[in-house]
UniProtKB/Swiss-Prot annotation:
Coiled-coil ranges from the UniProt annotation: 28-75
Keyword Mitochondrion: no
Organism: Caenorhabditis briggsae
GO CC, alphabetical: condensed chromosome, centromeric region; nucleus
Gene: sgo-1
UniProt name for this protein: Shugoshin
Family affiliation: Belongs to the shugoshin family.
Comp. bias (Polar residues): 167-181
Taxon lineage: Eukaryota, Metazoa, Ecdysozoa, Nematoda, Chromadorea
Keyword Cell division belongs to the record: yes
Function: Plays a central role in chromosome cohesion during cell division by preventing premature dissociation of cohesin complex from centromeres after prophase, when most of cohesin complex dissociates from chromosomes arms.
Amino acid sequence: MNAKAAQSLFGAIASSKKAPTREEPAVNFKSTNESLIKKNLQLKQQLSQCTKALEKLRNENIALREQNQELIDATLDEKMERIVEQRVKSRLAHAAVLHKKLVQNIQQTGLELGGIFKDMEPEPSGMVTRRAPKMECNLEKLDESPVRNFPRSDYEEENKSPMDIQNGPSSSSSMTQNLENGTPRMAQRASKGRRSELFHSLHENVPEEAAPAVGYKRAPLLIAPSETPGGPPKKAPPRKAPTPRFKKPSTPAPAPISDDAEMPSTVRRQRSAKMNIKSMKEPSVNSKLRRPGKHDEPMPFIDTFF
């Protein structure tokens, strides 16, 4: 190898190993290291969660195998009981989830309604509202008006009770004192009430006024002239009696019976309706027949008579 060729070869290798130029961006190793550390932690957490889930699934698999073996070894009644128990548990779990959701919805709607009612409340006004004070009536008390004084003799005679008759003048003196004071006070055992006595006496004292005599004049009687100058009007022809709409059907007279002795006592006499029968055809058995009476012939299938 020539010296010049060797120098040119080693010079090309050295030029390729030179430092980077300013145009290439510098790498931040600290930030990349932190991001890698965070990713490593996340992967570790995922790994722990996966291991826990795997352990849980293994335990469930073991429990299911045991239950399957128990079902295989158990009798028919035990199998039915286990199936019913599992279904009841699943239904109860489903009902618990629904109840939880329902409670959450009710609470949410209650909060929404509370907010709506708060928005609808009127704003407080600046006016001060007070209760009006109670007005007391300060009117003067009036004494009871005295009742009209009646003649003492009539009042005493009407309102005398058997107790007053026995007491004598003491009761009359007390009555006069009450009349002088104003309102008469009757005895406790009065025969009539105070109000009835007052109205009775007022009706008696009303004077009767005579009604003034009024003369009535009778108006003269006027006769209207007849329409036609001729004689009296002709009489209308008498009405005919109304013919009845429905005529009562007449039944034919019964045929005369020649000899009663010829007919036996057990046979019933012929009726007048038999005259209308044009043929001797027997009645149909489908329709209802007449119940036999005591004068009919004895029936062949009946032992007793009616």
